[in-house]
Structure formats: C-alpha cells, structure tokens
Design a protein with these regions (language model features):
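Active-site gating loops and adjacent loop-to-helix segments of metal-dependent hydrolytic enzymes
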Residues: 72-104, 146-172, 273-296
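Divalent metal-binding pocket/active-site signature
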Residues: 15-16, 106-114, 122-211
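Intrinsically disordered, low-complexity regions
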Residues: 28, 118-120, 273
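Mid-domain alpha/beta scaffold segments of enzyme catalytic cores
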Residues: 21, 32, 39-94, 100-107, ...
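A short C-terminal boundary segment appended to hydrolase-like catalytic domains
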Residues: 297-301
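An N-terminally biased module of ancient metal coordination in phosphate/nucleic-acid-related enzymes
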Residues: 1-79, 166-170, 179-267, 287
Length: 301
C-alpha cells in the first residue's frame, strides 16, 4: 500500500537532512507522494529534476510552507503557516510573496539568544548558531532548539519548545515574531494566481481559542477558494485530534491533507525510530490533485 507525506523539511530551511537523504528515507518508508515544503523556499526546476531522476519510484511534488500573518477579531497578529503544492513557480504574484517572505532574521534570533543567556542557558551568539547549523538559509527556533539539546540544557527539541521558546508552555525565552511576512490575503491570492493547492497547516499550533479557530477557517476558505484543504493527518496528532480536524474540514469544505512536518530524528513528528514512516493514505493526495485538475485544468510540476 502506498502512502503520502505532503509536509516535510530539509536543510533548505530548518530540517536536518538534505533533500536526497529525505527522498531515500521516503522510499524506504513506502511513501509514493512526497512534497518538499521548506519554509518560504521554492525549489528550482533543476533541483526537482535531479531529485526525480534519483528517485523515479517517488512522485516528488513541488511545495512550499509559507509564513503569513492573520489578524484575529481583537486585532492580534498571529503567524499562520500555509502549505502550497503544485503551483506555477514563475507566477509573478507568487514570486512577489516569496521575496516578501525573506526578512532579515538576525534581530529576532538575537533577542531569543539574549533571553536564553539571561536565564543562564546561553548557547552563544548569532554567529555561533550559524556555525553550529552550517549556515542555513532559514535560521530560526528549530536550530535554537537543537543547540539547546546539544548543550545539554534539554533532552529533546520538544522540551526546548515547551520550556523556553515555544508559543505554548512556559515560554521562558519566547519572543513574539517581528518578522514582516506577507498577510494571509496576499499568500492565498498568490497561490490562486499560481494555480496551486492551498493547505492550512497544523491548526492546533496557533494561539487561538475555538471561536477564533472557526473564524480562521471561514477566512481561509473564503480567501483560498475551491482548491484548498487543511491538515487532518499530522505527525504528532492523536486519533481523537484527527477525527476533530476531519469534522472541521468537512464543515468548511476543505479537503483533508496529510503531512508529518518532519524536520529530523529529534523532532516530535518523527516516528518512534526517528524516521519518516507515518502511514498517511495516498488517496489524500490523489483527491487534492483531482480537485486541482477540476478547478484549474492543470497540475504544475
């Protein structure tokens, strides 16, 4: 039986593995449909062509996880993530959003590092963190979490988020994002113009109560149009959470999507052995692609 994973990360953003290594893991895990969805990064045609030549048994999909901002009813600014699939990478509106979503992260990351240092759990400077992570294009909290593990302050990446840098939990060194990402309206408009699939990622990760979750879903559906979905099958979610998300997806006419959000073996979204072996049904992707063909008459490679 084939499987799908439509939400993964590599060293192009905050993942631990190269795209080729991730492709090999997917192949060994029985995955048929694999989307590389690095943060605010679009793979070049040459990169995808090389990966498809290496892994002809995989259906490798063009993807990107967009950061964007959403305004709540009380005008709070909440960072939301949207997975885009099978879009036209040459669409001018898409390119404009991608350029907008490349802010300088030094100030934001440095503020977190300074808070950690004040707590006595210092992991060095911005330059030290860059060196530790081998100069990634997208330096962020996942890299800080791994450094906290390496320095022995916490045992796992999840513990680093729960105690220090996550949006929930103790938030001892949490810093509100100041990065100037595009608003949700611009991201979803760009994905429609690029004839892509828009998927609302990990609904339970956002600091929203039930009423605001429903408001976000209504807004997302209205802006995303018919070629849209939301993550129902997700790495760390329980069966009960998935059932709840499936009901919400049906209520708002959003197709269910499936993604591990895999970053590496120390990630809470990895399988028990640190791998990429979540058995999400391939039919989930096939339904998304069928909707894209119905709406746009094309599936972009």
């Amino acid at each position: 039986m084939y499987h799908a994973d439509l939400h993964t990360h590599t060293i192009h953003s905050d993942g631990e593995y190269t795209p080729a290594h991730l492709g090999l893991m997917a192949l060994q895990s029985g995955i048929r449909y694999l989307a590389y969805t690095d943060h605010n990064y679009s793979y070049s045609p040459a990169e995808l062509s090389d990966l498809r030549l290496q892994f002809p048994m995989l259906r490798i999909l063009r993807g990107c996880e967009f950061s964007c901002f959403y305004r709540t009813a009380d005008q709070r600014r909440v960072e939301i993530h949207i997975v885009g699939l099978n879009f036209d990478p040459d669409c001018p509106e898409f390119q404009a959003v991608l350029r907008r979503n490349q802010p300088d992260r030094r100030s934001y990351v440095t503020k977190i590092l300074n808070k950690l240092d004040a707590l006595g759990v210092g992991i060095g400077t911005y330059e030290d963190l860059m060196a530790f992570c081998n100069g990634p294009q997208h330096l962020g909290r996942m890299h800080i979490a791994r450094s906290l593990v390496t320095h022995g302050y916490v045992k796992t990446v999840d513990e680093a988020f729960d105690i220090y840098i996550g949006s929930f939990g103790q938030r001892l060194a949490y810093v509100e994002s100041e990065l100037d990402y595009a608003p949700i309206e611009d991201v979803l408009s760009a994905l429609q113009k690029a004839q892509g699939i828009a998927i609302l990622a990990h609904l339970f990760f956002y600091p929203l109560d039930d009423a605001e979750q429903h408001r976000l879903l209504r807004t997302f559906k209205a802006l995303a149009g018919p070629c849209s979905g939301m993550e129902v099958y997700y790495g760390r979610y329980t069966d009960e959470q998935r059932c709840h998300l499936a009901a919400l997806a049906a209520q708002y006419d959003l197709l269910p999507s499936a993604g591990s959000d895999f970053h590496g073996p120390g990630d809470g979204n990895a399988t028990h052995d640190g791998g990429l072996g979540h058995h999400f049904p391939a039919s989930v992707y096939e339904a998304l692609e069928a909707r894209q063909r119905e709406v746009y008459g094309v599936v972009h490679d």
